[in-house]
């Protein structure tokens, strides 16, 4: 995991995200360690809210999996928690990052944002 490479890759994310302010996507400073769906002032999808209420806390590992397929990750999380009935709809995030090493690098960078 290379946070410097992740910072460079994060430029792709800046269409929707910033570290310090909500845009189309939530502010990402402090995301690692934060409960899903809880960035102050951001209007999340019901799917994101449900995952947070079911106990999803963003770890680097969760971020790596999420970036591969956000909707599939959240739906699997809810289903694994016995809440398949809440695993409906979709997250606002449609971007997917196929390369696992790149996902790890981005997650490492996000972990540096406080």
UniProtKB/Swiss-Prot annotation:
A single GO cellular-component term on record = periplasmic space
Which InterPro entries does the record match to this protein? Cyt_c-like_dom (IPR009056), Cyt_c-like_dom_sf (IPR036909), Cyt_c_1A/1B (IPR002327)
Q: What GO terms describe the biological role, i.e. biological process, of this protein?
A: photosynthesis
Sorted alphabetically, which keywords does the UniProt record give? Electron transport, Heme, Iron, Metal-binding, Periplasm, Photosynthesis, Pyrrolidone carboxylic acid, Transport
- Where heme c binds, per the record, is at 13, 16-17, 93
- Answer yes or no on keyword Mitochondrion: no
Asked if tRNA-binding is a keyword of the record, the answer is: no
Give any GO molecular function from the UniProt entry. metal ion binding
**Where found, per UniProt?**
Periplasm
Q: Give the family, as the similarity comment puts it.
A: Belongs to the cytochrome c family.
Physiological role: Cytochrome c2 is found mainly in purple, non-sulfur, photosynthetic bacteria where it functions as the electron donor to the oxidized bacteriochlorophyll in the photophosphorylation pathway. However, it may also have a role in the respiratory chain and is found in some non-photosynthetic bacteria.
Name under which the protein is recorded: Cytochrome c2
